[in-house]
Amino acid sequence: MKVVHLVLSNSFAGIEQHVNELLININNVDTILICNDSIEKNFDSRISTIKIKNIGRRSFFGKYKLKKLINNIAPDIVHTHGSKTTSIVKSINKNAYK
């Protein structure tokens, strides 16, 4: 199973620390973390990361690039962390949560 975790915040705080600890301790699952380039260096080096530039809720080009990246990875699950990340992913996937 392949799982993509998304963290699009600008600072490394509670959610990001939780994701860091979660991904270090997950076994037998192929996990990839997509995160903001400004916080990528704070995650443990054992975590497979893809850094992206900051994406705003209204950034059409940023959303397009994120959707293309997720489609290229072809995960079984996309796990969002944080309300901003969830709203961005929901807006690029009109079939989410139905």
Question: Which residues does each PLM region occupy?
Answer:
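N-terminal strand-loop element at the rim of the active site
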Residues: 5-62
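Short His-centered aromatic/hydrophobic patch
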Residues: 80-86
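Active-site proximal beta-strand in glycosyltransferases
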Residues: 3, 94-98
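Proline-aspartate-enriched helix->loop->beta-strand connector
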Residues: 70, 74-76
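Structural motif
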Residues: 2, 76-77
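Conserved SAM-binding loop
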Residues: 33, 78-79
